[in-house]
């Protein structure tokens, strides 16, 4: 009997955490659709699931990534915002803080533990007051100013330091990124996306695509459709285009 009571309590606790996560994500998603972060567009990977988002990132003007179109995916835990989401680039990105498989390494997505070896302060790590908006702002900052103290891609970090220390005379880092930017434009063309090339276009690209705000998200639509035991989306599925990017 005690065992049944304990299991029921655990289920109730899990449901409460998930309910809290759904409410937080629905609120954040609505906010980002109505007032996007400059240089980003967000969408749901599946219309009936708030726990997996797709992100389109436009390379900022006057940076190496200018004119680039980079796809990423964010996955949220059942106890969000108490635990951080993960973020993975689906487009190839040569950067000191992006692993070869696309996983993004950034302090704001790291759990709030004290780890002196990481070189990160506890205040730089995730906490429940952070939001997707603050994550996206951190990502655009990291693209321009990589953290080379503990790189995810050592080769990219070495190239970046050479490029930086030579005041741009060492072109290897820059040339790799330029090739990826050009390749990303081909992907944008396939998706029917116009890549912003000027500052004016860049700010315009982030604006909502509809003149009327979307109807309020019905939270009940999301409670029963997400299976936490489901396998993660395969690498093959993640690398393909989908309806969000083709809009």
Spans of features found by a protein language model:
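Histidine-centered catalytic/metal-coordination loop motif
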Residues: 81-171
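Short amphipathic alpha-helical interaction elements and helix-loop-helix interfaces
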Residues: 31-39, 61, 78-79, 112-115, ...
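Residue-level recognition of well-ordered secondary-structure positions
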Residues: 30, 73, 88, 107, ...
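Charge-rich (especially acidic), low-complexity segments
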Residues: 1-14, 146-247
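Strand-helix-loop interaction patch of compact alpha/beta domains
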Residues: 1-104, 108-118, 123
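A generic structural signal for solvent-exposed, polar alpha-helical segments
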Residues: 35, 46, 59, 71, ...
């Amino acid at each position: 009997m005690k065992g049944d009571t304990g299991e029921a309590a655990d289920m109730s606790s899990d449901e409460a955490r998930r309910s809290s996560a759904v409410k937080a994500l629905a609120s954040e998603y609505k906010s980002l659709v109505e007032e996007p972060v400059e240089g980003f567009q967000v969408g749901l990977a599946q219309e009936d699931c708030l726990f997996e988002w797709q992100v389109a990132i436009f390379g900022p003007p006057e940076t190496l990534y200018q004119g680039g179109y980079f796809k990423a995916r964010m996955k949220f835990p059942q106890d969000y915002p108490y635990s951080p989401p993960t973020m993975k680039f689906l487009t190839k990105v040569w950067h000191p803080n992006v692993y070869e498989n696309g996983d993004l390494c950034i302090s704001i997505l790291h759990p709030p533990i004290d780890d002196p070896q990481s070189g990160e302060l506890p205040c730089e790590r995730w906490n429940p007051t952070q939001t997707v908006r603050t994550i996206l702002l951190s990502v655009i900052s990291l693209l321009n100013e990589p953290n080379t103290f503990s790189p995810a891609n050592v080769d990219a970090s070495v190239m970046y330091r050479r490029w930086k220390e030579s005041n741009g005379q060492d072109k290897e880092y820059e040339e790799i990124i330029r090739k990826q930017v050009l390749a990303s434009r081909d992907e944008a063309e396939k998706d029917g996306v116009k890549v912003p090339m000027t500052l004016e276009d860049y700010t315009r690209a982030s604006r909502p695509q509809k003149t009327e705000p979307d109807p309020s998200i019905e939270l009940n639509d999301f409670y029963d459709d997400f299976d936490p035991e489901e396998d993660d989306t395969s690498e093959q599925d993640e690398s393909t285009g989908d309806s969000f990017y083709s809009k």
